[in-house]
Amino acid sequence: YRLADAEVPAMIASLRRIAERQLAEVERIVRDNFESRDALQPVRREELLKMARRGEAMVIDVRPAEEYEAGHIAGAVNVPLDALPRFLKKLPQEQEIVAYCRGPYCMLAYEAVERLRKKGYRARRLEEGFPEWQAGHLPVEK
């Protein structure tokens, strides 16, 4: 898929925040389905920017290739979830790996982090996804 305008991700992020504030059911769903999957604190965008500048993190975009090609976090490497086993030997052991996908409720990043940790990698997920990153006017590439 492709978001035609930078305002679209901002609108989606706003709608998500409104739903989170207005619907008690959203809080329960998030707690039951997401927070229980990942005991480690996710990486906030400010932290990721600092880590990347210092060379402390490798950022992987686990979305399908066509989504990555439409736009991605600057410096991120595309490692679609189904291709992760083939990329394992290319991933650095000395750096933390930060995975992201379509947003805070996208299961791809959770799954990638879980698989990486089982293989001995230090991995966390980005707290948000590419749409929120782009809406925040942070560095992106195409």
Regions flagged by a language model, labelled:
Residues A4-A70, K142:
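Flexible, polar/low-complexity N-terminal or interdomain linker segments that lie immediately upstream
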Residues S14-L15, G71, K90, G136:
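Residue-level signal for well-ordered alpha-helical positions
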Residues R44-E111, K142:
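Positively charged, proline/Ser/Thr-rich regional signature most characteristic
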Residues M58, R122, P139:
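Residue-level detector of anion-binding/catalytic polar loops
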Residues R115-R117:
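Hydrophobic alpha-helical packing residues
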Residues G120-A135:
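A short glycine-rich beta-strand->turn/loop micro-motif centered on a GG-aromatic cluster
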Residues G136-K142:
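Short, basic/aromatic-enriched C-terminal tail that caps enzymatic domains
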